[in-house]
């Protein structure tokens, strides 16, 4: 433990918090252009074809982003909105594409957790008899 004189001579170092999504540059989301849309396989215990896209952000970073949900309409040159959030079983994927924003369509026939997948509420059919 330092003495008061030691603290006067040299103050304590501030702990700098390292961001987990540096490409967003202090912003909640960033716009970007898809440069490549492809599938990749996850790490060892899991097995699937995960849909990902390489995105060139407005902050000049080129990042790999995960496309959540079943099915998508993205292709090269699509304009997308990217948020932070990693995918645990895909190394190097630290960003998610926001569904239902800009060129990205929402997930079709989604009934639960719709806000996460950009799906509008389905029209209520009149099944009740009056």
From Swiss-Prot:
Residues annotated with 3-methylthioaspartic acid modification: 89
UniProt GO MF annotations: rRNA binding; structural constituent of ribosome; tRNA binding
Similarity comment text for this entry: Belongs to the universal ribosomal protein uS12 family.
Region (Disordered): 110-130
Role noted for this protein: With S4 and S5 plays an important role in translational accuracy. Interacts with and stabilizes bases of the 16S rRNA that are involved in tRNA selection in the A site and with the mRNA backbone. Located at the interface of the 30S and 50S subunits, it traverses the body of the 30S subunit contacting proteins on the other side and probably holding the rRNA structure together. The combined cluster of proteins S8, S12 and S17 appears to hold together the shoulder and platform of the 30S subunit.
InterPro entries: NA-bd_OB-fold, Ribosomal_uS12, Ribosomal_uS12_bac
Species of origin: Helicobacter acinonychis (strain Sheeba)
Ranges of biased composition (kind: Basic residues): 111-122
One family name in Pfam for this protein: Ribosom_S12_S23
Record keywords: Methylation, Ribonucleoprotein, Ribosomal protein, RNA-binding, rRNA-binding, tRNA-binding
CDD domains, per database record: Ribosomal_S12
Assembly description: Part of the 30S ribosomal subunit. Contacts proteins S8 and S17. May interact with IF1 in the 30S initiation complex.
GO cellular component: a single term: small ribosomal subunit
Name used for this protein in its record: Small ribosomal subunit protein uS12
A GO biological process held by the record: translation
